[in-house]
Amino acid sequence: MFPLVLSLFLGATSDIWPLAPAEAFQLPPCQLINQTVSLEKEGCPKCHPVETTICSGHCITKDPVIKIPFSNVYQHVCTYRDLHYKTFELPDCPPGVDPTVTYPVAQSCHCGRCAMDTSDCTFESLQPNFCMNDIPFYY
């Protein structure tokens, strides 16, 4: 019984914990990485891939043992510290459709609270190169 409790506590079984604690420290830290993202705009027929920098990586998080009612617990995520925006003109947009698209370029990253206005903090978000124009539309 004790080895089972110990393994559950330490996260040694992959059925309960996806990563053992020692493995979590081998994940890449929160840092800038180069990433291809797909730019698209309603009314324009194609997506256009561009290379940009994004924040990606692991942030150490903790969950309090004692839960205090009505208190907020914030998990840190890898997010932008500084960023600027670039503008790109999509090719092949029909007349009357503004072809300009603005996208963020990360300059530095940190582990902090998620800012929903600049980051996607969902559990599983769309991939950066996802393109709505690639999905067939059925009437």
UniProtKB/Swiss-Prot annotation:
One of its GO terms (cellular component) is extracellular space. The keyword Signal applies. The keyword Metal-binding does not apply. Keywords: Disulfide bond, Glycoprotein, Hormone, Secreted, Signal. One of its GO terms (biological process) is ovulation. GO terms for molecular function: hormone activity. Glycans are attached at residue 34. InterPro entries: Cystine-knot_cytokine (IPR029034), Glyco_hormone_CN (IPR006208), Gonadotropin_bsu (IPR001545), Gonadotropin_bsu_CS (IPR018245). Disulfide bonds join 30-78, 44-93, 47-131, 55-109, 59-111, 114-121. Belongs to the glycoprotein hormones subunit beta family. PANTHER family: GLYCOPROTEIN HORMONE BETA CHAIN, LUTROPIN SUBUNIT BETA. Heterodimer of an alpha and a beta chain. Involved in gametogenesis and steroidogenesis. This is Gonadotropin subunit beta-2.
